[in-house]
């Protein structure tokens, strides 16, 4: 199947999704199956939403299956003069697949409460959202890059590597195995950072917890760090800032793991 015909099929499916729920039955959830160019190879999924949550789960199939849960418009309200609201059911969603890469995106007018995306287990993910939803990933094997502004990030029973950053929310990750030698990063501005690693973890930890504490049940060695002094002039004031993180080494060291939170605590757990 050529690239053009594949995109045409996906866009046709999206047009069908836009049919009002009343014409399709009482189920407001819209569903779309995305064919993959070569199901024998791992895939990569890129998801970007302005508004709405993202849920990604592993399944045993070879396709990407998307469920779109629209916002609840509520019942149409009476307007002055007897006028009533006509619901706008445009999803504002775009899906493309090319050479085992699936891109899913929304525009500013999207009316999505959340996407539930089922993918083959060996899938790498780049997912981001801004408002009105969290990011949740379960059971995947690959490289995960997860970014949110106003939501929490959860990755459960994943294998490979994770970069998870959010501004307002918690970061919680549990690994079944990790990619040896791969650096990772876990950051929240307003929330706890809680990561569970396999018991055989070897890593060099870079830790910053501005207003909180750092906890671990791994055996570790602290690594001496020189304080970094930054000076700058702010108007008529001369400001000196002292910046120092905590460095620790587990089992002789390994890949660099960065943990950072300003208004929260850091938990580094050993899987039981």
Indicate residue ranges for each PLM-predicted region.
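Basic (Lys/Arg-enriched) interaction patch that binds polyanionic ligands
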Residues: 154, 158
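A contiguous pocket-lining binding segment that forms or flanks enzyme active sites
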Residues: 183-186, 194-197
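Repeat-solenoid scaffold signature
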Residues: 188-192, 201-203
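N-terminal signal peptide c-region/cleavage motif recognized by signal peptidases
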Residues: 18-20
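Bacterial N-terminal signal peptides that target proteins for export
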Residues: 1-10
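Hydrophobic lipid-interacting interfaces of membrane-associated proteins
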Residues: 71, 133, 151, 169, ...
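Acidic (Asp/Glu) and glycine-rich low-complexity loops/linkers
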Residues: 23-128, 138-139, 145, 162-165, ...
């Amino acid at each position: 199947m050529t690239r053009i015909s594949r995109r045409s099929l996906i866009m046709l499916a999206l047009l069908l999704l836009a049919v009002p729920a009343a014409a399709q039955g009482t189920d407001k959830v819209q569903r779309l199956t995305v064919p993959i160019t070569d199901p024998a190879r791992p895939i990569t999924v890129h998801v970007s939403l302005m508004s709405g949550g993202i849920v990604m789960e592993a399944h045993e199939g070879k396709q990407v299956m998307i469920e779109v849960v629209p916002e609840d418009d509520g019942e149409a309200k009476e307007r002055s003069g007897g006028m009533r609201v006509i619901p706008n059911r445009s999803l504002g969603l775009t899906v493309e697949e090319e050479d085992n890469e699936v891109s899913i995106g929304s525009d500013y007018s999207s009316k999505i409460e959340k996407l539930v995306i089922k993918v083959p287990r060996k899938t790498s993910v780049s997912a981001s959202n801004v408002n009105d939803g969290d990011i949740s990933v379960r059971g995947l094997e690959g490289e995960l890059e997860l970014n949110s502004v106003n939501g929490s990030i959860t990755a459960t029973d994943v294998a490979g590597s994770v970069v998870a950053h959010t501004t307002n929310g918690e970061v919680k990750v549990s690994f079944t195995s990790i990619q040896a030698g791969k650096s990772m990063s876990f950051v929240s501005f307003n929330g706890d950072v809680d990561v569970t690693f396999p018991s055989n973890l070897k890593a060099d930890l870079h830790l910053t917890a501005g207003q909180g504490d750092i906890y671990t049940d791994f055996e570790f060695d602290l690594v001496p760090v020189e304080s970094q002094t930054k000076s700058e002039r702010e108007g008529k004031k001369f400001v000196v800032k002292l910046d120092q993180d905590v460095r620790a080494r587990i089992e002789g060291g390994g890949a660099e793991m960065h943990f950072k939170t300003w208004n929260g605590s850091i938990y580094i757990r050993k899987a039981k």
